[in-house]
Structures are given as structure tokens and as C-alpha cells.
């Protein structure tokens, strides 16, 4: 069985911090790169649909890179492939933590989930912007392909999760306070839904019947971030809620709840930054 390593936990929390601590809307001059370190605390279920969750604290690395092509910021790590006035095409990266079935009652006796990586293109479309340039509304259209990490890689199939995104700077009139919100549906192939929610015959029990998930609707997500910088210190928080009602796998015996929530907070000391400044929205 695979357990979540401290390194994997750091990467996951760092990815969320990229979304939390880099939120903005108005064009400003910022360092080309920044890095830092600090404590973070995250609470997350074992997987979407699990009624068991983990809390962990880690020393969290923080990296922001505002390159012309490669960027690590509020949308995660990505390579910008093409851009126009109100839209651009990215190639982005994401992933999932490994989960040990030895610690999850619903999956007892089944193989654990390996750590996985998601990669794929995403089209970002700017829909509107406030007159003061403090609020921007965007539509994000991603398509990702997933695969497990380790010696024997396994395909997880495809997923798309279009979201409506709102970014706001100087939230509640507080200078430097930034917030964001995103919401939208998730759709996945049978292969992806099956990896998380299938119960093969050899693992069926009296209370966990054999099950095969279908392709299609995989839930609705709602996420929010809030952050504030004080000179050399970043303070940030994030939260996410997914509703799994009426999904293609809602009746899987591995789905113990249709409500998925995760969140975290972090305090980051910015240890270094570039002298070079770039214009960033």
C-alpha cells in the first residue's frame, strides 16, 4: 500500500498556495521570481467521495515564476502556448496524492491509489473586467490526461473541468488583500472514474458489491482563495467544495458521501526575489 509522503504533501500544498498567494487582477509590476518557506496546515479527504480524511502540517515551499512562457502562479504551473488580447492557451500540470487502502475502511483489502500526474491544455478566456481593473472574470476550459507515477505507470484517461473564475484585488477595500472564486462541472472518461470508483469482482464483499463506473458527469466544484502580503510575509487560505450527487459513479460502494470539502492555511516568509520586475495582471 502507498502512503502519502511528506514530499508529496509539500507539492500538493505548494500547488494550492500558487493559486492562493498569487491571486490578482489589476496589472502591476512584480518580481520575475519569488521563493519562500513556511508552515502550512491542510485538511483533505482520502479521495472525492470518501468519508475519511487526513490533516497534516508541513514545511511548505513557495515559488512564483512569472516568465514569458513558463509561469507558476494562480493557475498552477503551466507553459503558455499562445495568447491574444482576451484569451490564451496554456499547457498546465496538476496531480493527486497517493492514498493507502490500509487506512481507509471503504477500500479495505483493495490496492491503494498511487500518486498521479495530470497534464493538458487549457484555454483561458477573459469575459469581463471592472472599470477600476480590480475585478476580472474569466472562463477556463481545460482538458487533462492523467497517469499514475512509479515503476508501473497506469493511464487514468481524460478529464475536463470548465470553470468560471473571478479574481479580485483590494477585497473589502483592504489594500493588498486578494481573493478568487471558481466554480464549474467536472466530466471524466470511464477509465478515470473507474480507477477511483470501480470495485473488481475479486475485491467484492458482502457490504461492498462489485461495481463498474460509467463515463460522464463527475461532480460540481466550488473553490475560493484569500491572501494578504505584509512586506516579506504571505498569509493565505483556500477552501474547496465538490458535490457528487447525480454523478456517473454516485452509487459506487466506495462513495460514502456526496459532499467533498478540503481546505488549508499557510504562513510564508518570502526569502528571496529577483531584482527584475515584470507587468502582471
Question: Where do the language-model regions lie?
Answer:
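Short loop/turn motifs that connect adjacent beta-strands in outer-membrane beta-barrel proteins
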Residues: 27-33, 48-49, 68-87, 128-137, ...
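Short glycine/proline- and aromatic-enriched beta-strand/turn motifs that initiate or cap beta-hairpins
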Residues: 28-69
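Residues that define the transmembrane beta-barrel architecture of outer-membrane proteins
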Residues: 33, 53-59, 85-87, 113-119, ...
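Residues on the lipid-exposed face of transmembrane beta-strands in outer-membrane beta-barrel proteins
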Residues: 39-43, 59-65, 76-81, 119-127, ...
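Sequence/structural signature of outer-membrane beta-barrel proteins
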Residues: 42-48, 98-102, 126-130, 144-151, ...
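Extracellular loop and loop/strand-boundary signature of outer-membrane beta-barrel proteins
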Residues: 45-48, 77, 106-109, 146-153, ...
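Outer-membrane beta-barrel transmembrane domain signature
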Residues: 151-234, 242-245
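Predominantly the C-terminal beta-signal and adjacent terminal strand-loop region
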Residues: 224-281
Amino acid at each position: 500500500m502507498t502512503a502519502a509522503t511528506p514530499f508529496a504533501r509539500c507539492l500538493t500544498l505548494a500547488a494550492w498556495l500558487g493559486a492562493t498567494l498569487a491571486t490578482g487582477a489589476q496589472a502591476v509590476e512584480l518580481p520575475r521570481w519569488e521563493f519562500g518557506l513556511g508552515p502550512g496546515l491542510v485538511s483533505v479527504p482520502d479521495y472525492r467521495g470518501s468519508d475519511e480524511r487526513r490533516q497534516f502540517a508541513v514545511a511548505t515551499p513557495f515559488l512564483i515564476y512569472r516568465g514569458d512562457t513558463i509561469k507558476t502562479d494562480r493557475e498552477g504551473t503551466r507553459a503558455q502556448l499562445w495568447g491574444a488580447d482576451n484569451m490564451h492557451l496554456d499547457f498546465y500540470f496538476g496531480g493527486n496524492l497517493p492514498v493507502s487502502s490500509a487506512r481507509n475502511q471503504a477500500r479495505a483489502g483493495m490496492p491503494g491509489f498511487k500518486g498521479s500526474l495530470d497534464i493538458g491544455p487549457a484555454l483561458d478566456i477573459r469575459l469581463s473586467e471592472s472599470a477600476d481593473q480590480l475585478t476580472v472574470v474569466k472562463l477556463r476550459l481545460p482538458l487533462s490526461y492523467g497517469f499514475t507515477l512509479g515503476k508501473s505507470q497506469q493511464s487514468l484517461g481524460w478529464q475536463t473541468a470548465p470553470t468560471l473564475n473571478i479574481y479580485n484585488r483590494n477585497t473589502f477595500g483592504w489594500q493588498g488583500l486578494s481573493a478568487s472564486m471558481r466554480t464549474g462541472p467536472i466530466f471524466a472518461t470511464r477509465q478515470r472514474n473507474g480507477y477511483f470508483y470501480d470495485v473488481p469482482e475479486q475485491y467484492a464483499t458482502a457490504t461492498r458489491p462489485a461495481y463498474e463506473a460509467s463515463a460522464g458527469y463527475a461532480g460540481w466544484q466550488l473553490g475560493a482563495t484569500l491572501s494578504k502580503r505584509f512586506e516579506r510575509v504571505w498569509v493565505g487560505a483556500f477552501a474547496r467544495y465538490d458535490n457528487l450527487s447525480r454523478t456517473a459513479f454516485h452509487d459506487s460502494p466506495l462513495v460514502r458521501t456526496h459532499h467533498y470539502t478540503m481546505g488549508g492555511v499557510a504562513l510564508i516568509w518570502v526569502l528571496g526575489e529577483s531584482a527584475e520586475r515584470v507587468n502582471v495582471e
